[in-house]
Swiss-Prot record:
The gene is guaB. NAD(+) binds at residues 247, 294-296. K(+) binds at residues 296, 298, 301, 466-468. The lineage of its organism: Archaea, Methanobacteriati, Methanobacteriota, Thermococci, Thermococcales. This is Inosine-5'-monophosphate dehydrogenase. Homotetramer. Residues 99-154, 156-215 form the CBS domain. One of its GO terms (biological process) is GMP biosynthetic process. Its cofactor is K(+). It is an enzyme of class 1 (oxidoreductase). Belongs to the IMPDH/GMPR family. It comes from the Archaea. Pathway: Purine metabolism; XMP biosynthesis via de novo pathway; XMP from IMP: step 1/1. Catalyzes the conversion of inosine 5'-phosphate (IMP) to xanthosine 5'-phosphate (XMP), the first committed and rate-limiting step in the de novo synthesis of guanine nucleotides, and therefore plays an important role in the regulation of cell growth.
Length: 486
């Protein structure tokens, strides 16, 4: 028998989410009692096992803030300049600080037009007015309304209440409520401005009790980099990013690995590398804290069709997880998740968390443009291997940067739209609810037990059809089971 026939006979069988179900077990566990927190690196623990994808129609700072507030993690995409990505990370970090230290200020002799420019640029509604390092006023968008051309000192509020650095949350909140103010400048013993407390930050800290924060009380955030862009990684690290995610279509590229090892030595942030689908890759990526699994499972990815390469996602996750366990690495399943049940399956197959693109691309916080088609709202969504994303700068992810002409790109993704799905909070509520339900059926009190107790059954095509609603015309669409198929 020839070696090529032997290749086929030795080929393993690959399974994806629709090919398997989890077998229900005897249990005393109820969904409301399960713990869905997970660790994705030695220093980063999430309260829900979900990350948003590093895609230019999925994650920018608004998505990252929303994800962290719900207990997950946003990975800001790299299809932008270094300075812009650094600023996006800083925006997330500023979103809920008790005391904002790097305060944007303005001088009293500046124009209100410049004040408005600063507010728009930094996504804020007001500015302390500072002269000789002392606070002399506060100016807000409300003060400026329709008063272009005037000076800040003409419109600012001059009677400013300040507080010391030792202020506690409850005391700051009480002062702001009693005085009906939205901002409290923080000063040192010499009266020098050292920070700012805002009402929106205090309210957010109380509202989002499941949020994930660092030791300074700031929201967690991750950012993507090319395996060769060491300068970007260093700048993001300086900006306080919690996790660097090396974002490439094929992380088992030996040139990329050499560069990633050098990068790892130059940053303090935790380090995730992806994507891979072969357990052998783990042996060469042990310098990472976690690996990201998925070659071509995404709804907008054409790698498997264009390149003929990939491993069905459940099998890929299981193979990589077995090897990663030997080195103490964490595993993130990236791509192919369509329903909450797929999250349950991915974790039972060995993942510590999942990364979502499609399911979050239709949310309010996603940066994709809204479009109306036949009276229904959609949001644009594209793969980072699509022609549009490559032209914007994402070609390097597929090792097509630099030497390729635009007209000669070989795309590995498509561009399209997905239905508008509401807010990130609403979508995650349904997804986490489904995860908890699955854990209840399996008898898993936490993510670790789901990995240990989850037992799979392989199903046929008829079994897949039986699993979905059938023999009925659905008249009321469920929030976790969309009727619109693409």
């Amino acid at each position: 028998m020839g070696k090529f026939v032997e290749k086929l006979e030795k080929a393993i069988k690959g399974y994806t989410f629709d090919d398997v179900l989890l077998i229900p077990q005897a249990t005393e566990v109820e969904p409301k009692d399960v713990d869905v927190s997970t660790r994705i690196t030695p220093n980063v623990k999430l309260n829900i096992p979900i990350l948003s994808a590093a895609m230019d129609t999925v994650t920018e700072w608004e998505m990252a803030v929303a994800m962290a507030r719900e207990g997950g993690l946003g990975v800001i995409h790299r299809n932008m300049g270094i300075e812009e990505q650094v600023e996006q990370v800083k925006r997330v970090k500023r979103a809920e600080r008790l005391i904002v230290e790097d305060v944007i200020t303005i001088a009293p002799d500046e124009t209100v037009d410049f004040a408005l420019f600063l507010m728009e640029k930094h996504g804020i509604d007001g500015l302390p007015v500072v002269e000789d390092e002392k606070v002399v006023g506060i100016i807000t968008k409300k003060d400026i309304a329709a008063r272009e051309g005037k000076l800040v000192k003409e419109l600012m509020t001059k009677e400013v209440i300040t507080v010391p650095e030792s202020i506690e949350v409850e005391e700051a909140l009480k002062i702001m409520i009693e005085n009906r103010i939205d901002r409290l400048p923080v000063v040192d013993e010499r009266g020098k401005l050292v920070g700012l407390i805002t009402m929106s930050d205090l309210v957010a800290r109380k509202k989002y009790k499941n949020a994930v924060r660092d030791e300074n009380g700031e929201l967690l955030v991750a950012a993507a980099v090319s395996p060769f862009d060491i300068k970007r990684a260093i700048e993001l690290d300086k900006a306080g990013v919690d996790v660097i995610v090396v974002d490439t279509a094929h992380a088992h590229n030996l040139k990329a690995i050499k560069s990633m090892k050098e990068m790892r030595q130059k940053v303090d942030a935790d380090f995730i590398v992806g994507n891979i689908a072969n357990p052998k890759a783990v042996d060469d990526l042990t310098f990472a804290d976690a690996v990201k699994v998925g070659i071509g499972p995404g709804s907008i990815c054409t790698t498997r069709i264009v390149a003929g390469v990939g491993v069905p996602q459940i099998t890929a996750v299981a193979m990589v997880a077995d090897r990663a366990q030997e080195y103490g690495l964490y595993v993130i399943a990236d791509g192919g998740i369509r329903y909450s049940g797929d999250i349950v399956k991915a974790i039972a197959a060995g993942a510590d968390a999942v990364m979502l693109g499609n399911l979050l691309a239709g949310t309010k916080e996603a940066p994709g443009k809204e479009v109306i088609i036949n009276g229904r709202k959609y949001k644009q969504y594209r793969g980072m291997g699509s022609l549009g994303a490559m032209m914007k700068g994402g070609a390097e992810r597929y090792y097509q940067g630099g030497y390729m002409k635009t007209r000669k790109f070989v795309p590995e993704g498509v561009e399209g739209v997905v239905p508008y799905r509401g807010t990130v909070s609403e979508v995650l509520y349904q997804l986490v609810g489904g995860l908890k339900a699955g854990m209840g059926y399996v008898g898993a009190r936490n993510i670790r037990e789901l990995k240990e107790k989850g037992e799979f059954v392989i199903i046929t095509h008829a079994g897949i059809k039986e699993s979905h609603p059938h023999d009925i015309i659905i008249t009321n669409e469920a929030p976790n089971y969309p009727l619109e198929k693409f």
